[in-house]
Amino acid sequence: MLKQNGGGICDHEVGTGKTLIMCIAAHEMKRLNLAHKPMIIGLKANVAEIAATYQAAYPNARILYASEKDFSTANRVRFFNNIKNNDYDCVIMSHDQFGKIPQSPELQQRILQAELDTVEENLEVLRQQGKNVSRAMLKGLEKRKHNLEAKLEKVEHAIKSRTDDVVDFKQMGIDHIFIDESHQFKNLTFNTRHDRVAGLGNSEGSQKALNMLFAIRTIQERTGKDLGATFLSGTTISNSLTELYLLFKYLRPKELERQDIRCFDAWAAIFAKKTTDFEFNVTNNVVQKERFRYFIKVPELAAFYNEITDYRTGGGCGR
């Protein structure tokens, strides 16, 4: 999968050796020149085990394992320069530490501007529909527009006031990320005109997931290809149809663009079906509730997912 695609999704059941597989994959990518400086990030509770597993598998490997002291305010700049200026076989750190790495402000500006453009397009479509649009839907999009404008203003200020001594992710030369327990980053921002549809999740997303998008886009721009990251999880999709779309948003932006899928609504129009049911609310009244309940065009969607996914179950490992 890594040699053919340059990344993807490891949909591996818990207990099937995911940690060792990840360490071997990172080292082999470096050895085969598929990546020059791979990075592994994991949960704070697991990251020491990941580093120990890597070191046990490859005792002579040059690993940079980030300690809590390395990410103290006094040492952080020196540590970032250490990543930038040295040719490590692998850099290993926790999710929280990864979130403290500055991202390229110019790239942030481009991504946030693209998100804002999509919101403005959605607002224009809704305004043209006139009376058929709920006030809540308009209000939600206008709030999202305001939040994106505030983020853009902050990034523009960072560009103007930037000093040359700040090393960001782009300058570090990381060209592949292995993300252990990748479901921790599933709450990525997305744009939609759907209002009060159950099961969509929070379209605003989290800053943690947005930072991951910035990092992955940095790698994709450097290589000129999709992927550039490997997601490893036992629960890649748990409780929302949007989670599948967001995996593609992270990893397959060029392919989505080729299919003219530029937002969640365009994807849902092709691959998901919305139903309307009558349910009891908290006050025991019957209310109408919309939700995305089914995937449609399942063979095409499965093929799209399987192109970049490696499956492993306990039964398949003889467990």
Regions found by a protein language model. Give the residues of each.
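Pre-Walker A (Motif I) flank of P-loop NTPase domains
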Residues: 4-10, 36, 89, 226-228
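Post-Walker A helix-loop "phosphate-sensing" segment adjacent to the P-loop in P-loop NTPases
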Residues: 29-35, 251-256
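A solvent-exposed, charged loop/short amphipathic helix patch at secondary-structure junctions
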Residues: 109-131, 135, 190-205
